[in-house]
């Protein structure tokens, strides 16, 4: 059976800590979408680990880790991550169906961002997915056969010829790209496997599989705040498509949310707080992107968005992260509905334009940091937790009270 860990905001919810906290109980941990535009930060024994492509189970020696087919892979960045760990042989596997991000993709991404202003990381994620959908991409499995790779590269060079100058690729692009693959393919090829068959077999054997997503539900290409979204499907449903596991294999869906809201990049954010309180949340919560170091926009918890995300993912339980960041705040707001042109909205619309938050205010608490038992939380903190649980209609199974793995309340 497989369990899914999915972000139910705009990403950066703390999925890495949760996966790291529970990964020891699983045989496989699988990253199922996105690219190195996303990042997990894990604090283990006082040491901070920033992961961009590697599944969070790499810190457990007995855990097998898979990068599955819907992930787009920068071989350079993956090689750099691999070099930071030891003994990954027979513990890390990259799907032969996953698509390869080329240096050209990053150049195209940066070029398009100048006019579109979406707020992308300019890592080449979107253009790589474009080539995938156009059936012209290079897959990880192509790196295993020099002849096939050469054919794919020649087709790529022909396709981009009209755009080389616009994207600033330079006269030596073809030579440089061949050298690029020569440098990194040798390092990455031992990890490339048919992970789809591997996971199907593992599921049939009854092995435990944990599927972790990147970004968050509200960035989903189809169901998020379009066009300010990522280029992949970020919901729990995409875990099946990417891994080859059928929907019957899914057991628990754990939705991850912060006790407040953040968003990086452009796009609508109804509960954003543009006052010094937003700055306080950013500073205390260390809200800076793992990948880009960009400051995250901060605001209050949005229950309209949270209910929507829980429904989309079929969440069976929630993990409430960073409760301690709200410590010491006298009045804590929660967005319970939107108002748009005089109309109250309680359902999440396809377009958030002109949506203003309707807040309910709660009394704050002094301290929750480091608490590991529910009964040790102050009454106001417990009331806040129970209100969220009641309004969303999904059990909160875990509360995080600091970045440390052990500072976790299990309910």
Curated annotation (Swiss-Prot):
Record keywords: Cytoplasm, GTP-binding, Ligase, Magnesium, Metal-binding, Nucleotide-binding, Purine biosynthesis
Cofactor detail note: Binds 1 Mg(2+) ion per subunit.
E.C. no: 6.3.4.4
Residues reported in the UniProt entry to bind substrate: 290-296
Pathway the protein contributes to: Purine metabolism; AMP biosynthesis via de novo pathway; AMP from IMP: step 1/2
Residue sites binding GTP per the record: 11-17, 39-41, 296, 322-324, 400-402
Principal location: cytoplasm
Binding of Mg(2+), residues: 12, 39
Any one GO BP annotation for this protein: IMP metabolic process
Function according to Swiss-Prot or TrEMBL: Plays an important role in the de novo pathway of purine nucleotide biosynthesis. Catalyzes the first committed step in the biosynthesis of AMP from IMP.
UniProt protein name: Adenylosuccinate synthetase
Lineage, opening ranks: Bacteria, Pseudomonadati, Campylobacterota, Epsilonproteobacteria, Campylobacterales
